[in-house]
Amino acid sequence: PAGVVGDSDTATFPSVNTETAYGWNKKVKMKLPLFTGALGSTEIARKNWEHFAVGAAISGVTLVCGENVCGMDPDAEFKNGKIMRSPELARRVKVYQDWYQGYGTLLVQANVEDTRLGVPEYAVEKLGVEGIEIKWGQGAKDIGGEVKLPTIERALQLKRRGYIVIPDPENPYVQEAHKLGGIEEFERHSRLGMVNEESFLKEVARLRKIGAKY
């Protein structure tokens, strides 16, 4: 700390100030300069969310809720192609908010499908989320997210929600092959976000308008 002479008695690790902040006009204070990885729609993220969320909240770091959480929520409700209710996203946000202590924040990712489904609006306006991360790819891998789907019913549900599903579960030949055991599973793919400076600035302005701070 400022004004303290460093010696063997004062230079102890609990005395070190690791606080930092990021942002431009509105800054996020953090106790440690750390972000979690994005915990999205995977089963392992769903099962372990509470541990990550509580840990991030009390540690004062930034927690990232990954893409496709609403779209993959089997109990989600939609109206005119827009998310109206997602028990899974609501659960995740509440766990973090219940333990939040003023440092860090919760960022919700929004990829192409999330944006089309109105996830940013739902997260900010209905759940009180303050930060949205615009998602274009998978970090160094500029591809969309992928998951396996074990049933044709799940494949049909996600295709109707706007996802790319292969093979096409609405194709009669695919349905017949599935019945005969020739096709045992399906794949859900997220679209690759494309960006240029103009569209990026326009989307940032839109997110700020709906109430996102970060």
Task: Report residues per predicted region.
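Active-site mouth loops of central-metabolism enzymes
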Residues: L34-K47, L107-T115, E185-S199
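Glycine-rich phosphate/ribose-binding loops and adjacent secondary-structure elements
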Residues: V165-D168, V174-Y214
